[in-house]
UniProtKB/Swiss-Prot annotation:
InterPro entries: Flagellin/pilin_N_arc, Flagellin_arc. Residues 1-12 form a propeptide. Flagellin is the subunit protein which polymerizes to form the filaments of archaeal flagella. It comes from Halobacterium salinarum (strain ATCC 700922 / JCM 11081 / NRC-1) (Halobacterium halobium). Its main location: other. This is Flagellin B3. One of its GO terms (molecular function) is structural molecule activity. GO terms for cellular component: archaeal-type flagellum.
Length: 193
């Protein structure tokens, strides 16, 4: 069963062969461990970045405090939203935000413009209500009015019509608000939406 090797040269060669195989196995294991460690580090950094991005999308939102419309000839020609930061949100720059307008006649995406409200077209503008900035929400106590010209987007909003407004911040978080025009606009200058 076991063979005895009596020649000294043959015994040394078997030992060197075993040593070479052992060293080769150690090298292969070291390379595999290095690849595994690099892959784990890459996945950890990707996971961390994805987590931070998801956290920003969830936490860096705005809250719509109120909405009202200006009435002209028994139609709503301006839609105004009062917005503030959600709890725990970072600074929100409304100039880098978009508003998706899905109304009775048209769906479009509005972008920021510093123009006067009557010349907005498919844009929106902002005015400070409370706070030092007219277009950046810095503190939770800040309030900014977002103004959209309904006639510039599609047409004025009549009695009973509604428009879906989705505000997307620079972080990618979305806040949706349904603005419902009351059934009666007679003898009114402004209405709650």
């Amino acid at each position: 069963m076991f063979e005895f090797i009596t020649d000294e040269d043959e015994r040394g060669q078997v030992g060197i062969g075993t040593l070479i195989v052992f060293i080769a196995m150690v090298l292969v294991a070291a390379i595999a461990a290095g690849v595994l460690i690099n892959t784990a580090g890459y996945l950890q950094s990707k996971g961390s970045a994805t987590g931070e991005e998801a956290s920003a999308q969830v936490s860096n939102r705005i809250n719509i405090v109120s909405a009202y419309g200006n009435v002209n000839s028994e139609k709503v020609d301006y839609v105004n939203l009062t917005v503030r930061q959600a709890a725990g949100a970072d600074n929100i720059n409304l100039t880098k935000s978009t508003i998706q307008w899905i109304g009775p006649d048209k769906a479009t995406t509005l972008t920021y413009s510093s123009n006067s409200p009557s010349s907005l077209g498919e844009n929106f503008t902002t005015e400070s209500i409370k706070g030092n900035n007219a277009d950046v929400l810095v503190e939770q106590s800040d309030r900014i009015k977002v103004i959209m010209y309904a006639s510039g987007v599609s047409s004025t909003l009549g009695s009973g019509e509604e428009v879906q407004l989705t505000v997307t911040t620079q972080y990618g978080s979305k806040t949706t608000y349904w603005a419902h025009v009351p059934e009666s606009l007679k003898d009114k200058n402004a209405v709650k939406l």
